[in-house]
Amino acid sequence: MLVSATEMLKKAKAGHYAVGQFNINNLEWAKAILSTAQECKSPVIRGVSEGAGKYMCGYDTVVGMVKGMIKGLNITVPVAIHLDHGSFDACYKCMEAGFTSVMFDGSHYAIEENVEKTTQLVKDAHAKGISIEAEVGSIGGEEDGVVGMGECADPKECKAIADLGVDFLAAGIGNIHGKYPANWKGLSFETLDAVQQLTGELPLVLHGGTGIPAEMIKKAISLGVAKINVNTECQLAFAAATREYVEAGKDLQGKGFDPRKLLAPGAEAIKKTVKEKMELFGSIDKA
């Protein structure tokens, strides 16, 4: 069932587990992630970046596809469609298209402008029953052209944004989009703890979930993280499985070139990755 992310994340924080946000890029990804969530009886958040939305022919197409799959696959677990790292304008476009959750990435604005824009979005999103995520402190790496240096957020700025009524908050704690470099210093749990102390029961979000050691993930959850974003790891798994299929010459055997067969190993690899993450996050049987 299609819902906002608010209640599932409140429940996750109270239950000391996290819900995974798995980004979708096409039909195969959407189907693999939805079916795995149903199998695992886990709530799930479908992340859609602005670039992925454009690739899939617009936000209306994304919503139509996900709604159709929920009906066609008889999906009964809670599902949110969430704009990932959205601009101010994109948030409104997604709300109009039927997204149930949006993230406003105002981390590149001065705190005063971030507060102003977030205040307006909170008012308009909540009027439609849509959940809203905000970000303080840019996440490292690149996400569809949005580049961050992996800085740590100012806990006081996090409180200022939290007090605006956002439903969950992404705070930079040294995390990075994409692959983590060998010299990565790890997550700043000191920052995360300080943010949680100031924001109370507000669910916190960890971006860049690919490659973070399991023990760090578990500690982050213990310090209030209730939503963890995963994208790169699914992409790598999909690419590796597809490469193996082609290099083994299976696309040349019979009708192995049929895209339904060609893309099947990649889809199975995504399902395996998603299930592993749901187990790690503790969300299995929490739907």
For the regions a language model picked out, list residue spans one by one.
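Metal-dependent phosphohydrolase cores
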Residues: Q21, T199, P213, P259
